[in-house]
Regions:
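Intrinsically disordered, low-complexity N-proximal targeting/linker segments that flank membranes
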Residues: 119-208, 212-213
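A cross-family structural signal marking well-folded subdomains
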Residues: 5-161
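Extended alpha-helical scaffolds
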Residues: 1-3
Length: 213
C-alpha cells in the first residue's frame, strides 16, 4: 500500500519507472550498508522495514530532487542506471541537510564517473556496497573520494561508446546535459516536453531534438 502511494507520487514527478528492486536495494544499503539478495532477504525483518519506510521514502524524495535540479535527470528514464539512484538515497539518509558546495561538487563528480566508466553495467550489488562506503561516506565527511579507475573523455572514447541507444548510459548522460538546456522544437519553437513515455521509444520523433539525423 505504501509502495503504491509512493508510485503515485513518483508518477507526478516523472520517476514512476524506478523499479521495486532499486527501492529494496536503497532500503538495504541504508540499513545494512549492503544490498545483495541475501542482505535484503535475511538482514531486514518486516517490522524494521515498516519502521524505516517513511524515512527512506523522504530520502528518495531528496535524492530525486537533487538529481533533477543539480544533474538534469528530469525523469527516471534519463537515469543512466536505475541503481545510480541508490547511493544518492544513502547520502541523504546519512546527511539529511542540503549538500554543501564541496559535497555537491563531489556528488556531481561521482555521477559523471559512473556514466563515463559504465560503472553499473555489471556487478551492481557489490559496486553499490563499495560506493556507499568508499565514496558516499567520504563525501558526507566533506572529503574527496579516491577512485581506482580513471576516466576517458577523448574523442576516440566518445566515438567508440557513443552509438545512439536509449539504453546507453553515456547517451542518457548526454541527454541529461542537453535536457538541462531547455530544448525547443525545430518545427514550432515550443519547449520540448520530456517524459518517460517518449524516452521509452528508440524511434521516438522527439529524439531528433537531441540527436538530429
Amino acid at each position: 500500500e505504501k509502495r503504491e502511494k509512493q508510485l503515485q507520487e513518483w508518477n507526478d514527478i516523472g520517476y514512476e519507472t524506478v523499479s521495486h528492486s532499486t527501492v529494496l536495494q536503497a532500503v538495504s544499503v541504508c540499513v545494512n550498508g549492503a544490498c545483495s539478495r541475501k542482505d535484503i532477504l535475511n538482514k531486514i525483518d518486516k517490522q524494521e522495514f515498516i519502521n524505516i519506510w517513511e524515512e527512506i521514502d523522504d530520502d528518495f524524495g531528496k535524492a530525486i530532487d537533487y538529481l533533477k535540479k543539480a544533474l538534469g535527470v528530469a525523469v527516471s528514464k534519463l537515469l543512466p542506471y536505475d541503481g545510480l539512484l541508490v547511493p544518492f538515497v544513502y547520502f541523504f539518509h546519512k546527511h539529511p541537510q542540503t549538500p554543501s558546495a564541496i559535497q555537491s561538487k563531489y556528488l556531481k563528480d561521482y555521477f559523471w564517473r559512473c556514466v563515463l566508466t559504465n560503472r553499473f553495467s555489471n556487478a551492481l550489488e557489490s559496486k553499490l556496497a563499495q560506493d556507499v562506503t568508499h565514496v558516499m561516506d567520504e563525501i558526507i565527511q566533506g572529503n574527496q573520494p579516491q577512485y581506482e579507475q580513471g576516466i576517458d573523455v577523448t574523442y576516440e572514447f566518445l566515438k567508440r561508446n557513443g552509438t545512439f541507444s536509449t539504453g546507453n548510459a553515456l547517451i542518457k548522460g548526454l541527454l541529461c546535459l542537453l535536457a538541462g538546456r531547455s530544448p525547443r522544437s525545430f518545427k514550432n519553437d515550443i519547449p520540448v516536453v520530456i517524459d518517460n513515455a517518449w524516452l521509452s521509444q528508440g524511434n521516438s520523433k522527439n529524439y531528433h531534438h537531441f540527436f538530429p539525423k
